[in-house]
Amino acid sequence: MKPVIDYSIYLVTDTVYFKDDSIYNKLEAALIAGVTLLQYRDKSAETRILYERALKVKALCDKYRVPLIINDRADIAFAVKAAGVHLGQGDLPPLIARRMLGSDAVIGVSAHNADEALKAEADTADYLGCGAVYATATKKDTSVIGTEGLSKISAATKLPFVGIGGITLENYKAVLQAGANGAAIVSAILGADDICQTVRKLKNMALEAKSVKI
């Protein structure tokens, strides 16, 4: 059975945080505090290292019952029995990834505009990662779509989606107000002085947003 996903606080890793094993303490702190979904993204690691790190991240996610998504690599997602995979526009087509991982896999697709969102929906994606919402040091070669871009995507598709790119405690609410189901966050969590406090603040804002919608 496909897992029910809460996209509200979607933690995404980055290569820069894998310089030493302290990353696993950071991830555990975030999971304890209430991260709802975790994506293992590590663009520069070799396949064997990707696999070994993914196993460690998967063990943490299992401990706190948080689904794990693997960035780009359907083979790694299959190998570690992750909940699914997140695909960029230049990665495997979603239909092929689903064939590899099965009908219960959670397939996410990056979308920068309404056309890409509709294409992903037609290709059986389960959710979208939309951005960059704001300028970000994590991905310097990406275009900024702003909250206006999120609103256009929200109007075009019924798929759940998260905003990604430059999202912080200060602008998280604006992302939700633009129609997003949550936000994919890297530096604002993993680079925080107090990871637990940061995640708890995000969690409170997400709960407030849900109560307003109800």
Predicted features by range, described:
Residues 1-92, 99-127, 142-145, 152, ...:
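Conserved N-terminal beta1-alpha1 strand-loop-helix module at the mouth
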Residues 85, 183-184:
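Paired acidic/hydrophobic, glycine-rich loop segments that form the ligand-binding mouth/hinge
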